[in-house]
Structures are given as structure tokens and as C-alpha cells.
Amino acid sequence: MPARLEGLHDHTPQPAPTKPRPPPDDKVSFLCDVHYEALDRKLTDLEIAGIVHAMIIGGLETTQYALEEQAQLLCENPGTFEHLRTDRAKLRNFVEETMRMRSPTHGLSTRMTSQDEVFQGVDVPAGSLLHVRFGAANVDEEEFSCPFDLDLDREAVTRHVTFSAGPRVCPGANLSRIEQQIAWGVLFDRLEIIEYGADNDWLHQPGIMLGTLRLNLAFRKAETPLSLGTGRNATRS
């Protein structure tokens, strides 16, 4: 090494850690910096872990179970797969209608009554805890005619409360809708049919979620794949 560069190698790494670097932009780092205004403090590790856990459930399992239940409804309604495969005009309706029929999240919101009430003939004392069930509301015969029938022409197809409503509506609702439409667009392009496979045990995830732990499907790959996608600005190949 030339004399003029002696000692440079030892010096170079030293200032590197002190130089400014772009702040991390991941969600966990963001949560670590959040100031909890209500209690005037940072979030605890337990609170951060709980938020991350809820994000995984809300961002993955809900859409996963929606797709799984939609596959079941396609198996149980002959002709619907082929109809949607060749005509994507009702794909959005299919996603909304199936989420209404089999809400991936059956209920999340728990409320405490502030006064005595009578609900559908049942006395509910003040201080009672009520668990609001989205799944039950979505098949209410007073709100939806023939609620257990898959109707791709149902009016006001987004009236369901699968994503809750009001100030507590799911912030990822529209993302989930897009994910489902894209997923089925790809599957309709590549497959000709899906059917129930063998050895399904129909064991469901316990708790507030609706979804089987395993779903075996049989399918036939399309000899001539389509390229209709979600039906927007697409053509046949």
C-alpha cells in the first residue's frame, strides 16, 4: 500500500455508523415510533405485537378464507365457473355476493349495553356484552331475499357488512376486493373447471373466522388459456 494511504483502511469504517441514513419505512419501525396520545407514551412491545398479529389476520387470513369459500360455492353451483370464465362482467358481483353469503370474518365488534333492552323478545340487561355477528346480518331474510342463494344479479350487492361499517369499517376492504378479483381472474384464465377433490374433512378454523383448515380441489387445466383477467381492458389470447 502506498505510504500516502497507510491507515486509511482502519479509518474508513469508523465514521460510517455516524453518517445519516434513510429512516426505515417498515410498519414495525413505524409502530415503534408512534406516540400514543391518549396515554401520552410509546406503544409497549405487547401492544406492537398485537397490532402486527391483527394486521396478519386482517391482511392475509380474511382474503384467504374468502377465496376458499368462493371455491366451495363454485363447486356447489354448477355452471357458475364456466359462466364467469367466459364472461367477467359479473366477477365483481360474484366476489361481493359470496362474501355476503359466507363472510370470512363472522364478527369482531363487542359492545356493552348502557341500558336495559329487549331484542327480538330477549331481555338484555344493562352492562351485557354483545358480540355483533356480521355473518348473521348478511343472511337476514328481512334484508336479503333468498339469502342463501348465490345471485349474481342481486341488487345493491355491496350492502353486506362483511367489512363492518361506519367508523370501524375495515381499512383494507377495497384492497381485499381487488385481490379476490385478480385471483379469480387468473384462475378463470388458466382453468376450465374446479370440483371438490377427495378426502375433505371439513374441519374449520375455530373462532370468529369462517374457513376450512384444508380444502382439496380437483381441476382441469385449460388447453387454451384466456387472458380476460378481471374483465377490464382484456382480450382473449
Predicted stretch roles:
Residues 1-237:
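Cytochrome P450
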